[in-house]
Amino acid sequence: MAKTEKLLNRLEELRQETGVARTIFAVCPNSLSVIRASFRAAKRNNAPIYFAATLNQIDGDGGYTGMTQSMFTKMLQFEADRVNYTGCSIVAIDHGGPWLKDKQRVEKWSTEDAMNGVKKSFEDAALAGYDLIHVDPTVDINVAKGDVIDIH
C-alpha cells in the first residue's frame, strides 16, 4: 500500500476510533531539534507525520541544515528508531522549482541552469526515498514583477 494511502487510512481509523477528525501533522525540518520534537509529538499523539523540506533546507549542497537528501532520510529513520516511532511518515520536497532556492535567485541562474539544478534535486530526492515532490513553477526571474508567468 502506498504511504500516502496508509497515512490517509490511519487518519480515518483515528477519526472512527475517537470521533475526532484530524489533520496531517506537517513539519518544516529546519533543525535537528525540530525533527526530534516532531517525532516525540507524533508518537505521543499516535499521529502520522509529514516532513516538508524546502531545497534551501535540504539539498545536494547540504542546504542550511547541512543535510543532503540521502543524509536527511537516513537521519529521519535514525531519529524515528531512537524514540521508537512506528507510525507512518511521509518525506517530501516542499516548493521545489527553479529559482525557489535562494542561491539560484540571488546568483541569477539562467533558466537552463535553474532547471537542471531542480531536476538534480528531484532526482536526488527520489533516490533517497522521498515519497512526494511538490513541483512549484511559480517563480521566473526573467518575468517582470506583476506580469503573469507563461507556463508552456
Residue ranges of predicted features:
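Core catalytic machinery and nucleic-acid-binding channels of phosphodiester-processing enzymes
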Residues: N30-S33, N45, Q57, R82, ...
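Active-site beta->alpha loop and helix N-cap motifs at the rims of alpha/beta catalytic domains
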Residues: G66-H152
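N-terminal amphipathic alpha-helix/helix-capping segment at the start of soluble metabolic enzymes
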Residues: M1-F25, A37-R40
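Structural preference for beta-strand elements that scaffold enzyme active sites
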Residues: R22-A26, N46-A52, C88-A92, L132-H134
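Terminal catalytic/cofactor-binding subdomain
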Residues: A21-R22, S31-I35, F72
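Glycine-/proline-rich flexible loop or hinge segments
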Residues: G19-T23, A52-Y64
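Active-site beta-loop-alpha junctions enriched in small/polar residues
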Residues: C28-L32, T54-I58, D94-P98, T138-D140
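Glycine-rich loop at the start of a catalytic domain that most often binds anionic cofactors/ligands
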Residues: R40-N45, G60-M71
